[in-house]
């Protein structure tokens, strides 16, 4: 969870810092932000001093550094990461939440906050709106290709995060 927190914090900070960019602005959606929920879960599992107990994750640090560079130099790239991370969370979140709840003996609240989106009452409609925002972006072919490249990077970076857990 600590590695995920580092990644989401970098993504969400980048989105907020670049919210004035016309391609980024439609994707600054705090209802999706996961860093606060991850902090709740980490406090539940590790206690009040959870921040001092996190072990560094090389894969998370590489991913977060990449997101920081995008925020500084190529903010539209953040959109691809928002798409892959958040739509993945919304799509598989319920199944993963149920599995985590059974494995951890939890029913709701702290420990499972990452999987809950209380500000999104209709997940399917929200996902459709997110995709519509993406489809409406005025992208050149080169810009669209750059977003695809970033989405592929996001998948590879996520795989590296999970490989560290194995």
Give the positions of each predicted feature.
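Metal- and O2-centered redox machinery and metal/ROS homeostasis
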Residues: 1-166
